[in-house]
């Protein structure tokens, strides 16, 4: 998802944490970006109103993009356009996803998530989004990834050409389980941004594990 020196193995996608202080959030994202390779950053709305969500996005998008990190805004196309984000993360039904892709294809990346089973995932995949996300924002509250997410990610990576992102757990070591599924991306949030953690050190540690343990993708994968 970035333009420079992309590793040919499972890469990190950051999920911005639920923090109301924009200055603190900016500091955390900036520190994480300094820690090493990060493909993209997804900004969930977390139920914020439009004004608060846009302010958060305006604060974070330039920071991430300055480090070559693509930024995806959850669901709100107007905010994504106003802040110059790279794409939109959509969680909803297939027809809504199709409309979004038709409107913004070629101008913004469109990713999706919310699938709870294979049928859900296949239906959304028919719209040909840029990626499929398996997990739920804010639910990486156990050391290991959710077994359902691992199962869906492994099946998807084996059967479907579209890239997928699988939510990791709240410990850095959980990136190994995600990488073992063959998923192109591992999503991290609590493992990076939990109180008392050093985001830069956590990103660096995750990349060390991925470099050592993740399989290399063949050209074109």
Pin down the residues of each PLM region.
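Glycine-rich anion-binding loop/nest that anchors nucleotide
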Residues: 133, 164-170, 187
């Amino acid at each position: 998802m970035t333009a420079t020196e992309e590793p040919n193995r499972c890469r990190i996608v950051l999920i911005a944490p639920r923090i109301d202080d924009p200055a603190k959030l900016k500091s955390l994202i900036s520190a994480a970006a300094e820690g090493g390779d990060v493909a993209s950053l997804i900004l969930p709305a977390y139920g914020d109103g439009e004004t608060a969500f846009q302010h958060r996005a305006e604060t974070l998008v330039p920071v991430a993009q300055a480090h070559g990190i693509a930024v995806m805004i959850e669901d709100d196309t107007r905010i994504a356009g106003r802040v110059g984000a790279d794409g939109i993360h959509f969680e909803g039904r297939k027809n809504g996803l199709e409309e979004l892709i038709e409107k913004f294809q070629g101008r913004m990346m469109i990713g999706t998530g919310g699938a709870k089973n294979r049928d859900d995932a296949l239906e959304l995949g028919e719209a040909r989004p840029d990626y499929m996300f398996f997990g739920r924002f804010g639910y990486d509250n156990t050391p290991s990834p959710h077994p359902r997410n691992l199962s869906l990610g492994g099946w998807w990576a084996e059967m479907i050409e579209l890239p997928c992102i699988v939510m990791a757990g709240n410990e850095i070591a959980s990136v190994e389980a995600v990488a073992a599924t063959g998923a192109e991306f591992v999503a991290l949030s609590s493992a990076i941004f939990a109180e008392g953690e050093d985001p830069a050190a956590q990103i660096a540690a995750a990349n060390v594990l991925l470099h050592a343990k993740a399989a290399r993708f063949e050209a074109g994968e």
